[in-house]
């Protein structure tokens, strides 16, 4: 009973709180807080009251008034501090700011925000702040140090007050600006200021005396303090001349701790005479600045090693400082080791908890605080700003997880996870929203598309919280559908139909869904379509390289749906091109000129598009003869947790050619990744290979190809289990990093965004640095998202050189920095054009050009662009006046280049050339155009060559070459047998056919024999490239069944029948035509036999004007010439003679459009319209006048427009008559073509003609009237 009451209570409460449980009051959320600690020296200065040194934003949102509280080192900052101390302020948006700071103000700062009405609160992470400060020396008393010449001197910088971010120097007592010089013999410890001189010389004593002693000076934040002065007292003794290196006490201990992401300095000092050379090594390998975040500043003579950003994976190891000089003994240099232990401030191991978590009422959920840190962090959970100290029946704290059980509305709120160790703290904030929603189908239900004889799935997915506990399905008759008898109702409510039947399953379905808050029912219609089926799939093939394969795929689908096809090779979609084509009308995928890379598994996918999606697949294996079979049984030795594994395999058949090597390919789960070769195993007997430094944070699969002299095998099946790697730092910077100058004063820095598999971890972004070269400015740093590929440099200036650098960073750490790249910003294009362009040596495929170089004072000339275009000299008639869009271009670099040979031209072609100077701003003005005709050359192979193979004949047909390279003068064709495996070595004797021939029958061949067919075309330069093809003649047999004949009416009582032979049998010697009227009971009549060698068609006359049926029969000398066997008759073609009056006086029907009366009627109508139009034009314009000024303006505008059109569109001319008359024809001059060199006076005399009435009617007529030359010439075309 109490369970029912509880359910009723919850139901009532849920109704009051609205189905979505959208809160009326938004809880407070911090929206702006610093992501980085303020710990860099000089970032926060002490005692500076001019500016606000500490500014910590803590903006937050919420429905009610908010209250901000800040804590410093876990103690609340008293609000009175903001009232009485003018150097501390708490702004209305929660920002804390301060100035005039002291060293005591360093530490952690944390922001708390509270809703003043609901008392719900939230908080930020603890932000670490270091105050750059200088402590004064405790004593300023001078002091003296006694030392012998040749012995080392070590002097401590005297005690002083607390300091941070300071630098040390030893300066003159007379003037602080005069420093005691640092050298390879003199060092100052950067962390303590202690002075170390390897050995004292007379020069040192003299320097001390000149400076009147030296003082330890400490400085930071524009503050300086100096200690008392040090003077030297020299003790008499014998000077030590030479010594080998030995290490003094160091401020760095043998075991050092560092924090990931922060700076770490290691310092070593050695004494020797002469001064030693210091080298830093990591695990025995010498370190260099700029690699793996290592910097060895030259100012410290190699004593200081700085790691600018510590990485656990790179730097948790042993570093060695080695010292050596010419006194180093045979045992090697002196060494000092530093073992670096890297600790880590808390960070999210994968990602922080979501900012919003929706949990259906009465359901379970969880929040995970997945953190990585060293040492282990303390994890705490908070609700509405209050720590959850113990679990309840509804919310349980389980280490880094927070578990919600049987959730009620009371569990809604702000939940925060904090993870803290000695190095830092991170905080998450999640609003947990409890949903209570009765089932609703407002987002729709159906329609459903099912396919005959396939599995059908009908989803029932209402909006509901909790998920419905009850689902019921009903058919259109209202009968409930239960699991069984071909139905299954899955847990999520989906109705599964095992095998769809149209008669049973087309119609309406209803789904009923219920939870304890309510129920809902929806009705949808199911339509059943015929499923997609492949009726003829591709077959497995083994073919030779260089041949062609045809893969057929025919499918059927529902007639109301559109059927599509796509092809895949090894699961990658095939891109169609000139070599790989899908012949849609034939349902054939054809691949020409096969290469070994084309081997693979080809899959045809036939489908109907979404939402009515149905697909069918069929696959075939295509092996390229000679290449090995792929390896099998691929195995991985481990799951790749450390980014290393070993791949093993079983070698496949080599196909009679020894395997040379193996190619290992890799692919990840990311959508932008593809199969990529990552290893070349050169040992042909290998059966395993180690894979190291794999891509991080990825699920990887591998496959392998074996390679022999014929090429690579098909790829193996990929590894069955994924290789899942841990996260790592990026190992590269973005590819194609460069500068791209744009218009004047523009510069874009561009790169190729890194593919997801190259990230090595989540959260990738780029750091970009840039500055103007030789400006003295610091590098400007910007941050760019992983998907970005460019950055526009602000205020780039006119033709200024910039330098820039990029780095990829992810949540694990920083990748390597790119080298500095330099580029000039944008400039204007050159203003001059190349002059005196001349043509030099000409060959069939090249033209030499020369010109005078261009100078440009406001930037650079990077080179020249040569534009060229042409057309065959056979058809060339006109010259272009502007560069057409299809022109080719060649870039010639170098401003001083004045001669260049353009290659790759087509023979026997008229080319035009235009040259421009260019730079990053674009092209300069165009040069004058020059022309050249290339010489003839040998032609390419004939085109559209078809080879029809029979038993004793081969028929070859062709068309002229697509690359004639001149005037074709002849063809030749021939054939020759071959028995070896290399038919290219066979010499073919060919017979000339003459230039007009388009077919050649090769006779007297041997059945079932391999032949090489070869043919060539010729120009005056000789025979061109051969077309060669290997074929095998068929067995001796009668002709195959002919194709349907082509029949055309040639007269009112006759037709021409064209014979079309069939393939697969012997060649046709003779053929006859069988014909009859298409009347029931009519018998076929036969023509006499026609010699197929002499003619391929026949005229049949004396026919009636009725429909006839025609078919053909063929024969040859099989099995004997005396008793030949006829072929089967072809299929029937129906046709009739040409309509008209027959010669026997019978009238047949004539189409209306060919009737004489209809043609006469059209002519009469046209004449009437012409007379009417002439009358209208005459009456409108008679006696009209207009002003001379307007007429002249119109004429000038027309001339300008015409000139503009010529310049943009281009026009052609030659020495003959122009294709179109000029816009203002001269009445007293001969026609002439357009000429760009004409003088402006050439247009004089082309004005309007003088009429008999003594006035210039055209010139001064009605201003509405267009002059004759402005009329559209097409206006009368209809009546001509």
UniProtKB/Swiss-Prot annotation:
Basic and acidic residues bias locations: 1262-1273
Domain of life, per lineage: Eukaryota
Gene3D superfamilies, sorted: Immunoglobulins
UniProt feature, compositional bias: Polar residues: 1118-1130
Membrane topology qualifier: Single-pass membrane protein
Residues annotated as signal peptide: 1-19
Region (Disordered): 1118-1144, 1206-1280
Database matches in InterPro entries: FN3_dom, FN3_sf, Ig-like_dom, Ig-like_dom_sf, Ig-like_fold, Ig_sub, Ig_sub2, Immunoglobulin_dom
Extracellular side: 20-1156
Residue ranges annotated for the Fibronectin type-III domain, each copy included: 628-722, 730-824, 830-933, 939-1033, 1039-1131
Localization per Swiss-Prot or TrEMBL: Membrane
One GO CC term on file: membrane
Disulfide bonds listed in the record: 58-111, 268-321, 369-417, 460-511, 553-604
Membrane-spanning intervals of the chain: 1157-1177
Topological domains, Cytoplasmic: 1178-1280
Pfam families listed in its UniProt record: Bravo_FIGEY, fn3, ig, Ig_3
One GO BP annotation of this record: cell-cell adhesion
Predominant cellular place of this UniProt entry's protein: membrane
Keywords: Disulfide bond, Membrane, Repeat, Signal, Transmembrane, Transmembrane helix
Expression tissues: Component of the acid-insoluble organic matrix of the aragonitic skeleton (at protein level).
Protein name: Fibronectin type III domain-containing protein
Classification of source organism: Eukaryota, Metazoa, Cnidaria, Anthozoa, Hexacorallia
